[in-house]
Swiss-Prot record:
Residues annotated to bind Mg(2+): 9, 52
Signal peptide range in chain numbering: none
The keyword Isomerase belongs to this UniProt entry's keyword annotation: no
Catalytic activity: apo-[ACP] + CoA = holo-[ACP] + adenosine 3',5'-bisphosphate + H(+)
Subcellular location: Cytoplasm
Coiled coil: none
Function: Transfers the 4'-phosphopantetheine moiety from coenzyme A to a Ser of acyl-carrier-protein.
Family to which this protein belongs: Belongs to the P-Pant transferase superfamily. AcpS family.
Superkingdom in the source lineage: Bacteria
Pfam families: ACPS (PF01648)
Molecular function via GO: holo-[acyl-carrier-protein] synthase activity; magnesium ion binding
Protein name: Holo-[acyl-carrier-protein] synthase
Cofactors demanded by this protein: Mg(2+)
Length: 108
């Protein structure tokens, strides 16, 4: 297996909270898989960063955010409805001001 792509993203917690305050559950339903939707806002922000990092690593902008499911604990990403070669490894973290994630796509 070789590294085929790397993506990284950072999300401002305050900006994420503002988007949620404006759009509420509609925002959550559009960007998160059903099993993710009940998570705390800080965890959702971290998963949003992870989904963005996965899109960057795979270089496939057509994948919907909702179809990128971050494993729990966040180690591997799955793409619902789309088969990808290899695996996408994910590491995420969040603290008071920011959430950050990196994704590494590994394939033959």
């Amino acid at each position: 297996m070789v590294i085929r792509g790397v993506g990284i993203d950072i999300v401002s917690m305050s900006r994420f909270e503002k988007v949620y305050a404006k759009h509420g559950q509609r925002f959550i339903a559009e960007f998160f898989a059903e099993e993710e939707q009940s998570m705390p806002l800080a965890s959702l922000a971290a998963r949003f960063a992870a989904k963005e990092a996965v899109k960057k690593a795979l270089n496939t902008p057509s994948i919907l955010f909702k179809n990128i499911v971050i494993g729990s604990p966040a180690r591997e990403a799955k793409i619902v409805g789309q088969e990808i070669q290899g695996r996408v490894w994910v590491s995420i973290s969040h603290e008071k001001d920011n959430a950050v994630a990196i994704a590494i796509w590994e394939a033959d």
